Amino acid sequence: MDIIHDNAADLSALNGKTVAVIGYGAQGRAQALCMRDSGVNVIIGVRPGKSFDAAAQDGFQVMSVAEAAEKADIIHILLPDESHGAVYEAEIKPHLKAGKTLCCSHGFAYVFNTIVPPADVDVIMVAPKGPGTEVRRVFEEGFGCPGLIAVHQNPSGKARDVALAMAKAEGLTRGGVLECTMAQETYEDLFGEQNVLCGGLVDLMKYGFETLTEAGYPPEMAYFECVHEAKLIVDLIYNGGIQKMNSVISNTAEFGEYYNGPQILPAEVKERMKESLKRIESGKFAKDWLEEAAKGAPNLKAKREALGQHPVEIVGAKIRSLFERN
């Protein structure tokens, strides 16, 4: 994949256009502030509450979602995946017309059809590959967070230019942008979260902690070894790759990686990952999650509560307090 930088993007594609950022959480705030700093006319659509007040305090023109959708040329929806469909149907769809653009930072709603846009509307994705706080921080430092763009519908013939312009306005083309499809971004994002970054890593940490504590080892030490020090390893990989990480750790640690890693995560794990990918690509995961969310997410809430009572969290709070500055 080619990496796209500033010289391939032109902010003039946004001249005379109003961008409505729908939602003002971490991503909404960061992207809105960066675009405004780049000279883009940005308004905020959000319901009354803390986010409404925060956007107003940041100096934005804030209004209802419906009003913002009516006024904007580009409607950038940055809400939780499970709420996109309802908000779109009630407050955005009535104000769409030919020539407008729908934008998102994650393709879930379009890939799994909770939003089915009219054919005469452009649909694009501009997705920073980092949390909102990081997007804003590196922008203010004069650099940019890498990102993705996608063109899902392009009746105007100008959708790609607009996506690149928005990416540039957010600083993403400074860091480097990759062009993909919404399906690629959605499937890969969900797969990474469920199998490696969240589902895989968290369960691996918990099993390691439980194994040591059940064998009689002090829980504080178990937390250090199985949870706390993960950041040290991930930072090394983040900055230099796996091979660089292996060159920094001890020979004993590296030998242990090759010696025991395949015993803990045998090839069968990869087969399970393939099944997970099939559940994502088929839409089964999305169906299950949307049904859960529609019920008020009782299972999700129960899992959250149970995790809060797990010894790894209780001990973790104790360990983290050691690093707090008084």
From Swiss-Prot:
GO cellular component: cytosol
Superkingdom of origin organism: Bacteria
Pathway: Amino-acid biosynthesis; L-isoleucine biosynthesis; L-isoleucine from 2-oxobutanoate: step 2/4; Amino-acid biosynthesis; L-valine biosynthesis; L-valine from pyruvate: step 2/4
Binding site for Mg(2+) 1: D189, E193
Cofactor requirements of the protein: Mg(2+)
Official protein name in the record: Ketol-acid reductoisomerase (NADP(+))
Annotated positions binding Mg(2+) 2: D189, E225, E229
Its job: Involved in the biosynthesis of branched-chain amino acids (BCAA). Catalyzes an alkyl-migration followed by a ketol-acid reduction of (S)-2-acetolactate (S2AL) to yield (R)-2,3-dihydroxy-isovalerate. In the isomerase reaction, S2AL is rearranged via a Mg-dependent methyl migration to produce 3-hydroxy-3-methyl-2-ketobutyrate (HMKB). In the reductase reaction, this 2-ketoacid undergoes a metal-dependent reduction by NADPH to yield (R)-2,3-dihydroxy-isovalerate.
GO BP terms: isoleucine biosynthetic process; L-valine biosynthetic process
